[in-house]
Amino acid sequence: MPTLSMFYGIIVYMYNEKGGKHNTPHIHAEYSGEEIVLSLNGEVLEPNSKFPKNKLKMLEVWTDIHKEELQANWQLLSRGEKYFRIDPLK
């Protein structure tokens, strides 16, 4: 699974969707073994009550800042092409 970015202990990744069944562009994130799925519009698609709220807020801010880059990566991965890394939250 391609890792797009890492910041403050959060690992953000996106699956290769070539021929996949997912319709909603989204990212996966992991922090201390807890995972969450977030649409590129900021909606939590697979809630995880153990994912820290402060880390979720950071993830939401990062997603908003990098929405265009995330959408471009979604398109690239959907076509089976190489993705690019995205700057971390600073």
Where are these regions (language model features)?
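Short, charged/polar N-terminal "headpieces" of proteins
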Residues: 1-23
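Short, charged low-complexity linear motifs
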Residues: 10-12, 49, 59-60
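Intrinsically disordered, low-complexity boundary segments flanking structured domains
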Residues: 1-2, 25-27, 72-73
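Generic structural "secondary-structure junction" signal
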Residues: 6, 40, 47, 53, ...
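Generic structural signal for residues positioned in beta-strands
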Residues: 11-13, 28, 37, 85
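A short, structured beta-strand/loop element
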Residues: 19-54
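C-terminal structural segments of small proteins and small subunits
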Residues: 58-89
